[in-house]
Regions:
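Glycine-rich beta-strand-centered segment in the early N-terminal region that forms part
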Residues: 2-21, 29-73
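Short, glycine/acidic-enriched capping/hinge loops at junctions between secondary-structure elements
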Residues: 25-29, 132
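Mid-domain Rossmann-like dinucleotide-binding core that forms the NAD(H)/NADP(H) cofactor-binding site
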Residues: 98-167
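A short, hydrophobic/aromatic-rich structural module that often spans a beta strand
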Residues: 26-27, 69-73, 138, 160
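Short, surface-exposed, polar/charged, turn-prone segments marking secondary-structure boundaries
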Residues: 28-29, 34, 40-47, 95-96, ...
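NAD(P)H dinucleotide-binding glycine-rich loop of Rossmann-like/cofactor-binding domains
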Residues: 45-52, 60-128
Length: 167
């Protein structure tokens, strides 16, 4: 437990409402060499968050604004505003910024369309089909006119892949 920080001039106080739990974070919990730096024991896990501005001394942000931040897994954080992206709750749930409209969605989009480049009528096989990336890959493939075969672990996930996602 730490005290809630007080923002200085030019800063905002953010309250974390949603945090992202992504597979790459497993590598951050190890001292082994990885593409993502490890997190020291006792420090907050690094990662994307959706936060609400609690107080502001920064003219670009008002109390109540929703932002995408990289403040890590902590209840409160102070930011000078750099690296924050305002979110419009009128465009859908702000939590989408951590999923379909965030890193998992971008990974699915670029991986499938830029690298996979599927064509209508082809079959796309998706591993981890009910996960954050796989479910989006399958949906994009369906939009491209592909037949999607989803692979998932266990009867419940397989049922969801078929009934909820249409794979």
């Amino acid at each position: 437990q730490t005290a809630v920080p007080t923002p200085a001039p030019g800063q905002v106080l953010l309250r974390t409402v949603y945090l992202s739990l992504d597979p790459y974070m497993r590598g951050r919990m190890s001292d082994a060499a990885s593409y993502a730096a490890s997190v020291a024991v006792g420090e907050p896990m690094v990662g994307a968050t959706v936060c609400r501005v609690q107080s502001s001394q920064n003219e670009k942000f008002a109390v109540g604004d929703w932002v995408l931040a990289y403040t890590g897994w902590q209840d409160f954080a102070v930011s000078d505003g750099s690296g924050l992206t305002k979110l419009d709750p009128g465009m859908g749930s702000v939590s989408y910024a951590l999923g379909v409209m965030g890193m998992p969605g971008f990974t699915a989009y670029m991986g499938l369309l830029d690298i996979g480049a599927p064509k209508a009528g082809e079959t796309v096989v998706v591993a981890a089909a009910t996960g954050a990336v796989g479910s989006v890959v399958g949906q994009i493939a369906k939009l491209k006119g592909c037949r999607v075969v989803g692979i998932a672990g266990g009867a419940e996930k397989c049922k969801s892949a078929m009934e909820d996602l249409g794979f």
